[in-house]
């Protein structure tokens, strides 16, 4: 990849990071524990800026000794290849994809050392990342092939993976339970602890009802259980994404509703008509977007990586929700890329 500079080289701001900011890394004080190392830096102010990263065994970055990664959309990066033992230097710049060139000064040069026998943990680039991913459903926990295997093992051992306890405690309670109504807002929209706690529990149980009935229905080939799970799912999909279970109203409720709908969309995909899939996916997209927008645009966890709710929602909500629909919704794939790169790099 070219790392040539534009004729109009802009100033590159490199502010000193605070204790709670993402750091410039690696440097010569960093103990590298995996190969390749993870590269992080403070983002520039410009929205949607892209970067070019150069890594070299030569401090002058001669072409022969330098690897260059361009058009990086985030201020953190994991290369798709490992490095040989040795001393390396790296720096970054702002990238213009139209001109295929660096358009700013290069950053301060930092140094790191790769030693022998480090765990090999490269990250496949975005272009090829999903090439070998199955597009069948379900995707969360078990694939169709693993479901077949699970059924076979359950026939030879009725308590395989503690199935009896799972069915008794996590499936049976939902067989007769009526479908949950949409939670009501707080009285006068003033948060009250007992209502917060009870609705939190109710939304957690929404996950249990949809997920556990759907799993048991598939494993036991029980149409009644699948129909019950579907009824819960379609009801939740009709709830107002901007209502009491929106992220802005009460994030802990919103997280659980989004996760419940994600499991339902995935495990009941074959039980839904095309119109029902559209309904459920529209709801899931709206709820996932609320979380993604908060994480990426408002909490800015790629700059402030210690916001507990925002960071937790990446693995708890964004990843499972986006896994279920990455091949159907372009934005979901973008959010999944962000989540994968954040979790693996930062």
Region locations from a protein language model:
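Residue-level recognition of well-ordered beta-strand positions that form the cores
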Residues: 40-42, 54, 93
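Aromatic-lined, polymer-binding surfaces characteristic
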Residues: 183, 196-346
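Short, compositionally biased P/S/T/A/G/V-rich stretches that sit at domain boundaries
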Residues: 1-38
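Extracellular fibronectin type III
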Residues: 3-8, 97-117
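Low-complexity, Ser/Thr/Pro/Gly-enriched N-terminal "stalk/linker" regions
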Residues: 117-191
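Recognizes extended acidic, P/S/T-rich segments that occur
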Residues: 50-87, 97
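Conserved aromatic anchor
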Residues: 36-46
């Amino acid at each position: 990849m070219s790392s040539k500079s534009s004729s109009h080289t802009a100033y590159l701001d490199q502010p000193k990071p605070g204790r709670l900011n993402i750091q410039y890394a690696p440097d010569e004080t960093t103990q590298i524990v995996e190969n390749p190392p993870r590269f992080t830096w403070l983002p520039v102010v410009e929205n949607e800026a892209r970067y070019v990263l150069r890594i070299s065994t030569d401090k002058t970055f001669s072409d022969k000794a330098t690897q260059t990664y361009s058009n990086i959309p985030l201020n953190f990066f994991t290369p798709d290849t490992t490095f040989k033992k040795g001393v390396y230097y790296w720096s970054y710049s702002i990238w213009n994809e139209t001109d295929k060139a660096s358009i700013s000064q290069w950053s301060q040069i930092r140094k790191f050392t790769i030693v022998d026998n480090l765990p090999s943990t490269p990250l496949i680039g975005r272009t090829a990342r999903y090439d070998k991913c199955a597009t069948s459903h379900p995707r969360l926990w078990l694939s169709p092939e693993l479901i077949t295997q699970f059924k076979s093992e359950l026939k030879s051992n009725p308590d395989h993976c503690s199935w009896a306890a799972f069915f008794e405690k996590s499936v049976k309670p939902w067989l007769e339970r009526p479908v949950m109504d949409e939670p009501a807002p707080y009285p006068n929209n003033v948060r009250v602890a007992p209502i917060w706690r009870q609705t939190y529990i109710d939304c957690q149980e929404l996950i249990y009802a949809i997920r556990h009935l759907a799993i048991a229905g598939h494993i036991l080939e029980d149409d009644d259980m699948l129909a019950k799970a579907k009824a819960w799912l379609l009801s939740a999909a009709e709830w107002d994404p901007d209502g009491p279970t929106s992220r802005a109203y009460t994030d802990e409720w919103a997280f659980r509703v989004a996760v419940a709908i994600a499991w339902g969309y995935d495990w009941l995909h074959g039980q839904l008509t095309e119109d029902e899939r559209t309904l459920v996916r529209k709801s899931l997209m709206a709820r996932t977007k609320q979380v993604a927008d908060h994480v990426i645009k408002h909490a800015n966890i790629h700059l402030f990586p210690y916001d507990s709710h925002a960071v937790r929602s990446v693995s708890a909500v964004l990843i499972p929700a986006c896994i279920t629909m990455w091949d159907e919704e372009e934005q979901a794939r973008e959010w999944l890329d962000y989540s994968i790169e954040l979790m693996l790099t930062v």
